[in-house]
Curated annotation (Swiss-Prot):
Belongs to the SRP19 family. Coiled coil: none annotated. The keyword RNA-binding applies. It comes from the Archaea. InterPro entries: Signal_recog_particle_SRP19, SRP19-like_sf, SRP19_arc-type. It comes from Pyrobaculum arsenaticum (strain DSM 13514 / JCM 11321 / PZ6). Its main location: cytoplasm. Pfam families: SRP19. The gene is srp19. The keyword Transport does not apply. This is Signal recognition particle 19 kDa protein. HAMAP family: SRP19.
Length: 96
């Protein structure tokens, strides 16, 4: 999803606990178990992306679920799956 001059990266896109039918875009092997917005921000900083954080917004299909709270607009023209895969991999490295 392209928005506000970049790509919108919702937490659910990389969350292992969210099924693909509900919004996850990565395969289970690449997804991260219950990522936080802070982890996503650290990963984006480490990868050198420019971004804007929106912590109080909920992913519309999962408006009732706290896992779906928060997104980041990444200032890039890369494809969403590529960005999501890089961020998920970096979060795994940060976690150890």
């Amino acid at each position: 999803m392209k928005k506000r001059g970049g790509r919108t990266l919702w937490l659910v896109y990389i969350d292992l606990s969210v099924p693909r039918s509900r919004g996850r875009i990565l395969p289970r092997s690449q997804a991260v178990n219950k990522p936080t917005l802070q982890e996503m921000v650290k990963a984006l900083e480490a990868l050198g992306y420019k971004y804007e954080v929106y912590p109080n917004k909920k992913y519309p299909p999962l408006w009732y679920d706290d896992r779906a709270q928060g997104y980041v607009v990444v200032k890039t023209d890369e494809k969403m799956r590529i960005i999501a895969a890089k961020v998920a991999e970096k979060i795994k490295q940060i976690r150890g």
